[in-house]
Amino acid sequence: NYFVNTEGTEVVQNRTYARIMISASMKAEDGMELPLNMSYFAYDPKDLPSNDRMIADAKDMVKRLTVLRDAPVVDPYTGPAILSGPASGVFFHEIFGHRIEGHRLKGGGETFKKKVGELVLPADFQVYCDPTLRSYAGEELNGFYLYDDQGVKARRVDVVKDGILREFLMSRVPLDGFPHSNGHGRTAGGGDPVSRQSNLVVETTAPHTEAELRSMLIEEAKKQGKEYGYYFKEVTSGFTLTGEGGSLNSFNVTPLEVYRIYVDGRPDELVRGVDLIGTPL
């Protein structure tokens, strides 16, 4: 990619990577489509998983789909739930990440516009976007770049510190209180650059193991008089509306693999037909 502007900026950067995606689906007897998918990403093809690993993953996907095809359909439910690590990543990207993109704070998408300096997450949470990270915890990251699509040098943006909202992701288009770009002007498909997420990282100073989260889920379900809570193991991006142009401020994330966690100790039960919907307010 080549970038030149009247400020005298000249940027040449190449971005090559390898990605393999596996998708499979089955149809239940009632006609419900049941998709599952996975992907592998690396900047060098030699760092992709072995063929044996990917074949084993594909076979496991078929086994899970076979069970999912015969799983019960859920009823409407309001109650406690927990998300796996990968599912939490999608959740934060859709529900939180899009609402800290500066251009969305104009024209009605103002969920957090007046929340700067206020507590928006638990005090042990830190959220930042860092396009300079090529990997994190041993995983290569797709959001890595050195300069954004407006020629601005990439940098880490600490969006939330100790639960308090500090900053938004900015392109060259200013926002009240945030007059300058912080290296997040991005484009796709030849469109105009807008402020978009890079590598969104969510950290906590008070982490819990999966076993601890399950125990907390069961206790909360008991408090609410529920027979079970839900565990979202795998989800895929749905859509989010941020209130721009008068649209409803809402989100819809598509769960692919969801389990009922029973409070009486029964085995976890795979279910289908789940939608994860709501508003961020």
Language-model features: locations:
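Active-site bordering "gate/hinge" segments
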Residues: 1-156, 161-164, 177, 225-227, ...
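Dual-mode signal for accessory low-complexity, basic/Gly-rich regions
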Residues: 115-281
